[in-house]
């Protein structure tokens, strides 16, 4: 009797990827068949309420290939919740996350699997260079370095989530019940010994990126509030510093006025500058405080990671989404 093959799960999140959905499916399928012939596989698409033909294309793929599964979200649940939810609904011996836009090279799959077979529970791709906009790459690099210095956890530079995760770590993700998960931080904080494989990130194959300044800022704030205390510490120390400087300057002005009562004219300019400066500082740190409170509120509300609209090619005994809560 032949030994049962290990199963590689490939999770592909999509949002308005009508030009890439079928090509990424074919590329992943062909790569596994060619370079990982001793493994079985499943491909799971999780679609974040696409507004184009993506869902129709994925539905056609599922009808043609029983190894392909799909989860259609009832709305857009964001760039972190949806992929995380897809990961915890894979069933393979390992799960590989890969973007539909081809910026995560499918040629990395056999390299990931080879390192996994050596015993690594997590094998990740780490960008060394990128063919994307050099300004964006520079800003991302600054972000990674900044968050690494400020974080309580040793964060991973140039890591987007692209990688292979053993089923034991996938179970860890299921057990976390985090309603606002930040996978990159979770891997750094809770992941076992990992292998990092460097790669060059290619350009998006087709279509337009869905990351804008707001989504990038949202990602930065999630990592900032989840893994650093620096915002609150900065507010405390800077507030103390401003109070000390204001007290000293106040004494200087008072002494100068007492000594040169008739000739010293302080005027309103210093006062106005000081008021605007302190007001700006207060508003900045109130914003920081608000980010922390929003992060806490999201966790306290205990809402589901995702609410499903539909799923395709799942076995009947697979748990339904509305019972999968981030508790």
Model-derived segments and their meaning:
Residues 13, 73-75, 163, 236, ...:
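Short conserved micro-motifs on helix faces and helix-strand junctions that flank
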Residues 61, 89, 115, 149, ...:
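Conserved catalytic core of Hanks-type protein kinase domains
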Residues 73-75, 79-89, 94, 105-183, ...:
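Acceptor/aglycone-binding surface of glycosyltransferases and processive sugar-polymer synthases
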Residues 16, 38, 175-179, 229-233:
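Alpha-helical structural elements of signaling/regulatory helical domains
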């Amino acid at each position: 009797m032949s030994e049962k093959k290990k199963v590689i799960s490939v999770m592909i999140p999509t949002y308005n990827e009508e030009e890439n959905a079928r090509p990424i499916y074919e590329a992943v399928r062909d790569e596994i068949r060619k370079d990982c012939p001793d493994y079985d596989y499943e491909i799971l698409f999780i679609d974040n309420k696409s507004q184009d033909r993506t869902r129709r294309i994925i539905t056609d793929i599922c009808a043609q290939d029983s190894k392909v599964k799909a989860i259609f979200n009832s709305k857009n649940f964001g760039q972190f919740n949806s992929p995380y939810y897809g990961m915890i609904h894979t069933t393979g011996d390992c799960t590989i996350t890969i973007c539909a836009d081809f910026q995560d090279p499918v040629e990395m799959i056999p390299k990931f699997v080879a390192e996994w077979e050596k015993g690594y529970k997590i094998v990740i791709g780490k960008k060394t260079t990128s063919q994307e906009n050099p300004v964006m790459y520079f800003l991302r690099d600054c972000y990674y370095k900044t968050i690494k210095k400020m974080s309580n956890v040793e964060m991973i530079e140039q890591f987007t989530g692209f990688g292979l995760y053993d089923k034991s770590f996938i179970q860890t993700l299921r057990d976390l019940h985090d309603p606002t998960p930040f996978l990159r931080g979770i891997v750094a904080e809770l992941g076992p010994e990992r292998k990092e494989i460097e790669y060059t990130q290619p350009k998006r194959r087709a279509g337009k990126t869905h990351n804008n300044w707001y989504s990038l800022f949202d990602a930065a704030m999630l990592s900032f509030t989840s893994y650093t205390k620096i915002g609150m510490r900065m507010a405390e120390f800077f507030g103390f510093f401003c109070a000390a400087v204001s007290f000293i300057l106040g004494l200087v002005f008072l002494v100068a006025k007492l000594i040169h009562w008739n000739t010293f004219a302080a005027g309103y300019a210093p006062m106005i500058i000081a008021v605007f400066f302190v007001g700006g500082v207060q508003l900045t740190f109130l914003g920081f405080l608000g980010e922390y409170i929003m992060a806490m509120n999201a966790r306290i509300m205990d809402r589901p990671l995702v609410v499903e609209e539909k799923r395709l090619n799942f076995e009947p005994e697979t748990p339904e989404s509305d019972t999968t809560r981030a508790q």
